Amino acid sequence: MEIYTTGEFYPEVFKAKQEFFDQSGTVHDDDVEFEQRMSLFMDWYLFDRQIPSLGMPPITHYIRQNQIDFSEEEKQLLDNLAHSIHSVFVFKGTTIFGKKLVVQDLFSKKKYKVVDPRLSQAFARGDIFEARLFQHDGKFFFSQGFCFHPVEMKSFIFNEIKKIRFQDRERHLQLILQLAQMKLKHQRFAHIDVKHIYGFDSKF
């Protein structure tokens, strides 16, 4: 997948960064969430965003161009990557003995049991966050990027998602990025009531 970030595709990465940060808020290398946002960007670039000249995301193009060279195991792995779940989730708790995290996709309403017990202490029941899930061998795993939203804005986030649940994927992604921008503004204007930040008529 490195080929889609270098050489002839390097200018495309630059354009994609502008698009992503225009929609989700520009981060600087000294921002607390810089590494998280860069991880979210790379996943979005590789798995969600269509490269105009190709008419598809890099992962889809890579599979189509190289599928005859893949083993069955590699085909399954790449197909799972192409069908990753990028969404806003709510943390519901853990399974017995805390071996898996239970999260619910707020768009599809589906629940997933995620294999990553190391993260269990990073979550509190009711946490709302943007993340990406990958499936491998029938198990779900988180990608590296997260964007946690203030729990005080639960009703706002739930209501906005409810409005567009049955719209297309592009509209879902647009809202996910808009919420990420609101979170970034909330961090930068921490002295302002979050209710004045999370909204489409916000002055901030």
Locate each region found by the language model:
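OB-fold (S1/OB) nucleic-acid-binding surfaces
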Residues: 92-112
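Mixed-charge, low-complexity intrinsically disordered regions
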Residues: 1-88, 93-98, 121, 128, ...
